[in-house]
Amino acid sequence: MSTEAEYLKQEDFLHRSNKLREIVDLGMNPYPYEFPGTTSVEDIKKEYISQPLGNSEDATNKETPKVKISGRMVLFRSMGKNAFAQILDNDQKIQVMFNRDFSSVAGLPVDAEISPIKFIEKKLDLGDILGIEGYLFFTHSGELTILVETVSLLCKSLISLPDKHAGLSDKETRYRKRWLDLIASDEVRQTFLKRSRIIKLIRHYMDAQGFIEVETPILQNVYGGAEATPFITMLNALHSEVFLRISPEISLKKILVGGTPRIYEIGKVFRNEGIDRTHNPEFTIIEAYATNIDYHSVMTYVENLVEHLVCELNDGSTVLTYTHLKQGPVSIDFKAPWIRMTMKDSIKTYGGVDVDLHGDHELRKILKECSSLPEESYMTAPRGSLIAALFDELVCDKLIAPHHITDHPVETTPLCKSLRSGDADFVERFESFCLGKELCNAYSELNDPLRQRVLLEQQQAKKALDPDSEYHPIDEEFLEALCQGLPPTGGFGIGIDRLVMILTNAASIRDVLYFPAMRRLESEKD
């Protein structure tokens, strides 16, 4: 049973609704269809901020440039015959001045009992979206201002804005009602503008490197490409159970078999797992593959891409400073090459454990001492899984500077080539880390179809013993494609949300997602 939204009962909503009715009673449309021909505030500032425009008297005489803008009114103060407001357009604000003898209100009847300046003072509210036509000038303090000739009400706001000084202090509200967060915070708007720019820069960089952007299905008959729990849904038209993809990897490799040598995809993936500071069930990823290269070349690709992004966003500098870390402000240089270290060496260097000197029983004892993991998760685990668990517990958080951690245990993935040294217990996989966060996952891709089948069948045997494990099913079409022939290939996946976190100094993944996953409110439940 649905209940009436609480805001409909609030005094401010009722007061603004009364104003709305009064505006309609004046014969005005508070929600017009269009307001064409506007110029952005950003473009106006770029063109006129350094020009000698003149003063308010020049503007009153219409001797200064005329402009037309639209935006949300976020500040208003009345000063006798004049009133001043700030208009927010995208991420830019500009001051406008209403004058009792000069400014008019579009659509206000000439015989209305209320004057234009009184209409502006009494009927408009902070949050209203206005169209402004008027003349530019500089105030005595040098502030670029528009003397309003005509103001048009483009949208009446019925809910008040957050306090301009306090902003939105409640994180729950910020994430649930991101539109308020965007209105209230310049910093939040800049973060999301930067996110958009980052994705554009990635596309431009990949295109310049000769990669072709492709699209693969989000709904899959067989999920794979990662070890994760999928979301399951039903395709009614085919009476078939399907999965939201946990990775585009398998589909992308099928395209490589078809003869396209360099491809990438930017898109959503879905993993039905936990939510924390760096994880959201729905997230954006770039996966890219190139033939005739290995994981050494991929490391170079990845660090060059990230260095390029840092330079583009940071006026050519490769150094970013982070303020939210436990150890205080830290400056990090992203200039390539990054530190490269095997997983075993990283455990020895950062964790103080030389795994080659310890048997499996000893590794389990070390895990028990240093880990909060339940014992059953590792007491019967193979050696490779123990090494990977030790890395997670002892090393990850200490990788503040950019690192490539290479040569992972074979148990961590079935989709990667073994080390060319002949050690079948480890694979040519690397993960890139920064600020204690995993940023990238990459392989020398396994292209031997017979070896691939063996590894996948081994996983299925383990899944039969542990149905709750995250091993993905065998995709026979994928194995058939590999039999057709996949050239030597290197590939990588980068979580764009985490990358944006790193590039914007964000402490949580929720700060870089417009609408992160949130628990349903009681009022939203049936």
From Swiss-Prot:
High-level lineage: Bacteria, Pseudomonadati, Chlamydiota, Chlamydiia, Chlamydiales
SUPFAM superfamilies in the cross-refs: Class II aaRS and biotin synthetases (SSF55681), Nucleic acid-binding proteins (SSF50249)
Family, similarity comment: Belongs to the class-II aminoacyl-tRNA synthetase family.
Reaction catalyzed: tRNA(Lys) + L-lysine + ATP = L-lysyl-tRNA(Lys) + AMP + diphosphate
Gene3D superfamilies the UniProt entry points to: Bira Bifunctional Protein, Domain 2 (3.30.930.10), Nucleic acid-binding proteins (2.40.50.140)
Name of the featured protein: Lysine--tRNA ligase
Required cofactor names: Mg(2+)
Pfam families membership: tRNA-synt_2 (PF00152), tRNA_anti-codon (PF01336)
